[in-house]
Curated annotation (Swiss-Prot), chains A, B, C, D, E, F:
<dbReference type="GO" id="GO:0006364">
    <property type="term" value="P:rRNA processing"/>
</dbReference>
<keyword id="KW-0694">RNA-binding</keyword>
<dbReference type="GO" id="GO:0009022">
    <property type="term" value="F:tRNA nucleotidyltransferase activity"/>
</dbReference>
<dbReference type="GO" id="GO:0003723">
    <property type="term" value="F:RNA binding"/>
</dbReference>
<keyword id="KW-0820">tRNA-binding</keyword>
<protein>
    <recommendedName>
        <fullName>Ribonuclease PH</fullName>
        <ecNumber>2.7.7.56</ecNumber>
    </recommendedName>
</protein>
<comment type="subunit">
    <text>Homohexameric ring arranged as a trimer of dimers.</text>
</comment>
<dbReference type="InterPro" id="IPR050080">
    <property type="entry name" value="RNase_PH"/>
</dbReference>
<dbReference type="GO" id="GO:0008033">
    <property type="term" value="P:tRNA processing"/>
</dbReference>
<comment type="similarity">
    <text>Belongs to the RNase PH family.</text>
</comment>
<dbReference type="GO" id="GO:0000049">
    <property type="term" value="F:tRNA binding"/>
</dbReference>
<dbReference type="GO" id="GO:0000175">
    <property type="term" value="F:3'-5'-RNA exonuclease activity"/>
</dbReference>
<dbReference type="Pfam" id="PF03725">
    <property type="entry name" value="RNase_PH_C"/>
</dbReference>
<keyword id="KW-0819">tRNA processing</keyword>
<keyword id="KW-0698">rRNA processing</keyword>
<dbReference type="InterPro" id="IPR002381">
    <property type="entry name" value="RNase_PH_bac-type"/>
</dbReference>
<dbReference type="InterPro" id="IPR036345">
    <property type="entry name" value="ExoRNase_PH_dom2_sf"/>
</dbReference>
């Protein structure tokens, strides 16, 4: 049985509070069970040097964890003076997947910064950040369209992300930290509202997995992502 | 008149939500008007090297701002690779003032980390961090006493902090950002519940100030701090 | 047609020169077409702090590129003072996948460092590094067993890695840089000699992909990896 | 009694050697007892980015300590690769207080860099740096006026700084290191020649202090600063 | 007798493989006994800021060692986040000596980057880097002249470098690591093809040396450099 | 003619003020013409890790320049966060040459730190640092012997250093900055009181030099160093 009594194909309760940070162009506090992430979107009227004069925009993400988002206090990355490898990996993933559903030309020469700051961590912080980042992005785009900065909606599809894995030999949806840390196989999946894949990252943590395992996990992820997309679509 | 219609000796509305971060030993979300800070306290069973074998504890603070806590997105300090001068100054202030009301010997050979993370900034973030940090500290000490880690209460007095300043020639209590940025004189005061000073930091931003100005500002601060202490004492 | 005239399911020529760096415990110069990577394995008789007293070993990897491994000279990471996000991501991938085929307890309290330094880059440097890192690892383990440092072979299975992708609508095996940079979908696959998955990383670069696309790419990767494993098995 | 036999309201001997560094636009070696600081002023014909096109100048300060300015050799900050929190705090203080007596518009689009390097430290290095920095600044301004770079004198008032504190229950002026390290209350005061306050920084090191204590310390500081200003006015 | 049986005035076998890195403008794998260095030359069409608008070019060098170029694995400089003192010293030496034989005005406003990466180290890596860097530089200049980028040959003379030293009281040519680490006197000499000195760096490692010792070592170095220049001149 | 009217074989006026920094174990302010360096020696009762349990001591040096030691203000290395290549090179040189005249076993398990801080720079700062560092070292050793920390004098010989060079075709002794910056050949020589070489660093800045040039420069340096040694021997 799962630590919190869920069925293997059941998500943790989702709670989404939009407009959590008034200063931001778009923002959300997203909660999946005990995992809580503040996501903001910030529009900047310039693009990074490598996009200069290409008449298109950019979306980039940064990810952080408050020192006491974890059961044992973590060292602050600003104090250590280095952004760690895991952080780099996660922020590249968030930026890349969000860019996949945005028409960067319609964005114009603008950068949208997505900041995902984990205030409590209980597994699945990177997938919650993608989902929350998407919601904040949509809010910021709406605001920019209302202000006439952007004329055509650059967002091509909705997206959401979830983790799946094999724990004690069972394929399970939406792993909490206790499951994640003992998973035999661990996978993060990002999909569009239209049911296609944006990103698959599957890792054999304890033993290699078969194609059959892979297909089971993909089905679980599809189910979970469909449910999250439904929640997003029903927000105000 | 003040930007938000307050009287010169009036605080902004205070809201304090304790136990905001479940993982922490003590935590609070403190709000003064639009300024919002998450404060956590974390107990670690060791002391920094310079206190080795002195049979006493330590309290240290770290302060950060989420990138979009401000109207214009700030660079993340972990990204710049350096903790800035202002951050250093603030975290030294928080740690020093909290240590002033704690009997470090009663704490035993432990460090309490106070993390203050600003999620929205509208002036007074350092004083809100001291007040919030104190509340989180008290919660953590209670928890440690309940667990039998600490036998005698090491907290000697309550403390709270507020900013005051001279704006457009008028002494004012609890400056919001719009006032702070045009203040002629700017002062941060930390006092105990018993009415004594822990820290006075007064700066002539535009013109030097007289002893009379100083005394007016101290009176305003005393009034504000008394009110905040009353709110803290009435929490659950 | 592919830039180098290959068929879509055809690997680039592989060349493997073992014992390329005499000082190392195991080493190889691996070439896939114009991609060339020096991989070394170094045995150190201690483990990282987090494994202290757990009676098991560790495998960790570092990855670098010579400044002129690329058509345009790159900034040296030692000069920039920071290991970049892409580098972090790759070295975490190499370490994780190699650990997946090693019984760390049989290794004893030792760390094996795998260093992968790209001397020429033409796509697929991370998968070549995994394959080359595996060969260097095997050499180092042999040497340690001959020296009596290790008594039982800790390597549980062989592994190899390859990239696949969709380019101009066609699923292709082993992308060179010209293909990789215009791929619609890009995937790195790591598999064992026994045909199971260690890692799947698939990314929609230009458009989301379907489950059918995924299955085609996995088949291509399986074919390529089987061929590489055969080459490895036939070395000396 | 005080360690060096002074009365509680007595300054240590002051020695000021102007033009100590020939290369600088203004320079001084200032000594207060055993505390010795080299201060230089350097005029640069540009302003920091945030002042661009505002038709005014800037004054900024940097502070350092030679490794053997202290009884036990300190680590060099260039070696540690980080400017510490205390250094940041002090250099911000020096810059801010000097700017308070300068009309930045009369300075024109120039930056004056004040460098304060402690060659021997025996308490009061930050206040000696402010006083010495002011003298170097005046020299540099004179030189710039003689050269016709600046037409109207931008310096509005003289300034000096001193530390005061409560030691063994007694309010004392100009603490040496032995006193500073055991002070119950510690205060740094910066005042103008016209008797007004530029900065007050008071800290309860051992116990909170009353308003009465504060007023005693302010009177001591006023007396000391008046004496220092007199010395400055009598130079050459 | 010498560890490898050479006579005191005998070089180790030299092997030079030009065009080792296809991507580079010029490249070489140079081997002196067991010391092996990859040198590349990269032409960039701009100059460093300090040469702006001076109508001349620049040559600069960077030096690195693969982590397992040494018998015991070294920490990667990118990982430590700092380029060490020895590396700085060597890359300044390489750049300075190569510039001494180049007419920077004939180069035009271009920078040539010389990268020297040691893949195996057995003494003399800095002198091998100078010799190899020179060969790569010549190749890059030829390529630039063929492409019409440069019209007149900027290279004024050939250069080569070698180490000499006093070991067990005997002056010896081309020290291997075992000799270098016990040398009483250690000297690196860079000379032109026309027999003049570019750089002499002699260090008393164990005891001070006389002018007579110096002259013996210079003669040995002259002999060795003449032989290396002959090898270079005979390359295809 | 030389900028300051000296003859080609004439030193600039030397001034040596011992015990300049009271806190240090040994200290000196050394001046050669307008070049002024504060050198201190600090004894620490431990050795670096690589000398652990070898029953011998170590001497290491650090070198810095005050920001306004130069005609145009330099960036502070602590601010840039990096110790530059030139600084690294110089401090390695100072440490190496001082170690050459000290019997490290007689020093016992101690480190002597030599800090050389340039307060005004007019050429020859590295050679002045070696000479000044030697004087500070001698003072510190005397103090340690008086205190009974060291029983036998570990200093085997005196040492001094000077720069020489070819300027406008003429060999000259003790170059000032104006000469150094236009020198055709530039050489730094370190010798013992007994007339032997510790270090020779000669660089062709504009054209390669002959053995005859070398011998002329060595003679000039010998003359200068003999004179400096005489000054040192005549101090109190």
């Amino acid at each position: 049985m799962r630590p919190d009594g869920r069925k293997n194909d059941e998500l943790r309760p989702i709670k989404i509070e939009k407009n959590f940070i008034k200063n931001a162009d778009g923002s959300v506090l997203i909660e999946l069970g005990n995992t809580r992430v503040i996501c903001t979107a910030s529009i900047e009227n310039k693009v990074p040097p490598f996009l200069k004069d290409q008449k298109k925009g950019w979306i980039t993400a940064e990810y952080g964890m408050l020192p006491r988002s974890t059961p044992v206090r973590m060292l602050r990355e600003s104090t250590s003076g280095r952004v760690g490898g895991r952080t780099h990996e996660i922020q590249r993933l968030i930026g890349r997947t969000l860019r996949a559903v945005v028409d960067l030309e319609k964005l114009g020469e603008r950068t949208i910064w997505i900041d995902c700051d984990v205030i409590e961590a209980d597994g699945g912080t990177r997938t919650a950040s993608i989902t929350g980042g998407y919601i904040a992005l949509v809010e910021a785009v709406k605001k920019a369209m209302n202000a006439g900065m952007i004329t055509e909606n650059p967002i091509k599809d909705s997206i959401a992300a979830i983790s799946v894995g094999i724990v004690l030999g069972e394929p399970r949806l939406d792993l909490c930290y206790a499951e994640d840390s003992q998973a035999e196989v661990d996978m993060n999946i990002v999909m569009t509202g239209s049911g296609k894949f944006i990103e698959i990252q599957g890792t054999a943590e304890i033993y290699p997995f078969s194609k059959e395992n892979l297909l089971q996990l993909l089905s679980l992820a599809e189910k979970g992502i469909r449910e999250i997309i439904r929640v997003i679509n029903n927000l105000d």
